[in-house]
Amino acid sequence: MDGLVPGIVQDARTGEVLMLGFLNATSYAKTRETGFVTFWSRTRQKLWMKGETSGNRLRVISAATDCDNDALLFRVEVEGDGLVCHEGTVSCFTKPIAIPSQRQGPVVGDPGVRAEVNRG
């Protein structure tokens, strides 16, 4: 991904996923330095501190990597009015899509369904 890693932003209080952006080494260092999520804008080719203009900055409460160390999760507190998306919504994930169900019977995680582990 040309030195970019996806950064998922989640509300630390509610757990809601707010947005996805990309970070490079410079934006990651800036995030660590300031305590506010800073992305690399792929369209503008420059650093982008989310909320710097609107006042809805993303204060990092905690951060983690995924199991492959190729994605970041930021749990944040949103400053300002809390509207993270440029479309004026709390989350950027507001456009539902229909996906036909592929389920055939019970699935692990459903109530009463447990995974069986073969330790043989």
What is each residue range found by the language model?
Residues 1-4, 12-13, 17-18, 23-120:
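C-terminal binding/interaction regions
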